[in-house]
Every structure is written in C-alpha cells, then in structure tokens.
Amino acid sequence: MGGSGSRLSKELLAEYQDLTFLTKQEILLAHRRFCELLPQEHRSVEESLQARVSLEQILSLPELKANPFKERICKVFSTSPSRDSLSFEDFLDLLSVFSDTATPDIKSHYAFRIFDFDDDGTLNREDLSQLVNCLTGESEDTRLSASEMKQLIDNILEESDIDRDGTINLSEFQHVISRSPDFASSFKIVL
C-alpha cells in the first residue's frame, strides 16, 4: 500500500467527502482497513474499488466483533443482491452513518432499518423480540421468559406505538429516539 498507485485520487476523495460524513483522513483509513481484508494481489486502488469483501471478513473487524447487531448492520449496508458482501462504498456508507458527525435523523433511519429484521418497514412484535434477544444475549441465563418478553414488548408498544396499530413505524421510532439523549453518541463505530 505504499506506492503511488495505492492512494485514492484527490477527486475521488473529494467526492467521498461530499457524499459521506467522513473526513479525508477517515476515508483514507477506511480504505486502508478495507484493503487489509483483501488478498495482497488485489489491493491496488482500482481493484479495491471493484472488490467485495465477505461478511465473515467484515465481521472479523474488532470494531464490529462485539456488536450484537453486527450481521444486521452488514446486511443493511450491503448492496449485493444476496447481501453477503460489502464493497468499499458500502463500507464507507456504514462508517459514515456510524460516525460522530452523521445527523440524528440519518442515524435513527438506519437504526430502524437494522432493527427491522424482516425488512417490512415496521417494527412488529417479532422484530422487537429479536432486538431484545440481541441485546440480552441468547443464552439460557440471559434470555427472557416468554411472559417477560411479552410484558416488555407490550410496554415498548404502549410507549412507542402512537397510532396503536400494533407496530412501530419509522416516524414513531424517530419520535422515541429523539427523547433519548444518548442515542447519537452510542450509535457509532470508530476505526
């Protein structure tokens, strides 16, 4: 990665800065980290911009390894039809949304998509159950009982489901998130 052919052009860097919430230095670091996941012979700028990295490789990054939503995060940001790999631009989009400078609206929009496990545009009881299981862990010691889960989801819906349709839509989710001062600062990944 030391040769002149291994750096992103000034034009491309400027374009990525315009399209993301990342600084020039953050984009260069992201490119370096992405290239480290590629085989040595495919690390030129041209090849790295065309390459796709498997979700397994992305999930091996220390910044994602401990995140309980890591698989969902990667699937939401993947543009491949099978959602099983990320391009460099997918990786940049992911880092941009999770950066300190991304707006609360952008962060809440993507958090909603990550928590919408069935991709139907709403958070229903099953999505909320999966969300809770991701947060509490799925071991016998940490898993909630069926009655505890039902009570928790009932409470979440009581608090969040403004139109009382049994689900949480994006605007209801954003309303709840707007009342959570720690959300934006906790919804981040730093390389």
Curated annotation (Swiss-Prot):
GO cellular component, one term: cytoplasm
SMART domains in alphabetical order: EFh (SM00054)
The keyword Magnesium is annotated on this UniProt entry: yes
Lipidation (N-myristoyl glycine): G2
InterPro entries: CIBP, EF-hand-dom_pair, EF_Hand_1_Ca_BS, EF_hand_dom
Localization terms from the record: Membrane; Cell membrane, Sarcolemma; Cell membrane; Apical cell membrane
Binding-site residues for Ca(2+) 2, renumbered to this chain: D161, D163, D165, T167, E172
Binding site for Ca(2+) 1: D116, D118, D120, T122, D127
UniProt keyword annotations, A-Z: Angiogenesis, Apoptosis, Calcium, Cell adhesion, Cell cycle, Cell division, Cell membrane, Cell projection, Cytoplasm, Cytoskeleton, Differentiation, Lipoprotein, Magnesium, Membrane, Metal-binding, Myristate, Nucleus, Repeat, Spermatogenesis
GO molecular function: calcium ion binding; calcium-dependent protein kinase inhibitor activity; magnesium ion binding; protein-membrane adaptor activity; small GTPase binding; transmembrane transporter binding
Chain segments annotated as transmembrane: none
Membrane topology: Lipid-anchor
Function: Calcium-binding protein that plays a role in the regulation of numerous cellular processes, such as cell differentiation, cell division, cell proliferation, cell migration, thrombosis, angiogenesis, cardiac hypertrophy and apoptosis. Involved in bone marrow megakaryocyte differentiation by negatively regulating thrombopoietin-mediated signaling pathway. Participates in the endomitotic cell cycle of megakaryocyte, a form of mitosis in which both karyokinesis and cytokinesis are interrupted.
Further remark: The binding of either calcium or magnesium significantly increases the structural stability of the protein in comparison to apo-CIB (calcium- and magnesium-free form).
Record text about domains: The EF-hands may also bind magnesium ions in the presence of high Mg(2+) levels and low Ca(2+) levels.
Protein name per UniProt: Calcium and integrin-binding protein 1
Phylogenetic placement of the source organism: Eukaryota, Metazoa, Chordata, Craniata, Vertebrata
